[in-house]
Amino acid sequence: MLIRNIEQEKQACMHVNWYELFQKNTIKSCIIPVPEDVLAYLRQDMLILPKECSNFTDVSTGEGFQTTHYNAFDDQFDGSDGEEDDANEQPAFPEFSQALTDAIRSLGGCAFLKSDWHCPKDAQWITLGQSLCVRDITDVYQLLKASSFCKEDFRERSEVNESGYHIVLKKWKDIHPGSEFRCFVRNRSLLAISPRHWPSYHEHIARERSDIVNDIVSLFKEKIKDTFPLKDYVFDVYRPGKDNVIIMDFSLYGKGHSDSLAFDYDQLDDEALVATIEEEDDPEFRYLPNDCGIQPIKRNVYGFPQDFRNFFQGAASSSNGDTAGEASAEGDSNNLVNRLIEQCNLQQLHDDNQDHA
């Protein structure tokens, strides 16, 4: 049995290592190396944002774009009595923050954020619009600090991986969920295709099935198969229209690495053993042919926890009755509490609307 070198596979799937190979077939991106001091900050659990994320700072993000952003975290540390530890002092990363601002501006003022392998989808509840669209550095820092997925990417790595640590900003695009697909490659053969947002139903998929498969197969055979260095991997694509397929990402093949969505990895492995060259032109494409009713929304899995809602709502109620002399760490964090309660209310409103839709 062939022993996999997971570290080398992960390195191949890093955005920084495949972007130039497929630059003409993917979304414009800015890749920003993470300095050691920023990396140490991102690894910490503290919720202090850098000094550059100041209150009511106007951030010019390009022609026609002007963002005014209030940072609720900063007020936790205003009015310091001078006795707090150095560890609680607000950090500053002027050069890195400027690089982020310049990148967002160059991408038109809106960008999709990810680290080397993951996007902070588990933290989008913390943004005002509950979106992964970032418009300024406050959005970037808040998402990175709140995301367990990204924090995992910032952990110490094997010496095999010498590519460093990066923040990736992609030009923002409003993508219809029914136009994203996940493709499974085994032994350099395209075995299967699944809708990326399985098991959601999209009427046009059944109607355009042949065109979808043909377009993805063409991209794979002409651009990816002989270029991407791995034999087994998963890649995601976005198909905005006929004859137009855009590479979104590459990830590791197999259980524990990439969601198999409409398939099972054991089944895919069995099919790979008997696959023929001819079958590569017609990979199995699974999709819902009929509307099965309301399906669970995966985004809600990463929504604001109900326990947290109860805790912060209780903290806010008790803080309203505190006197100045009774203020504690909870009282010092009122601005954060209010911020999180606001997110609770926004999500509750969204959930209620979904229930009545």
Go through the PLM ranges and name each one.
Residues 1-357:
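Preference for protein termini
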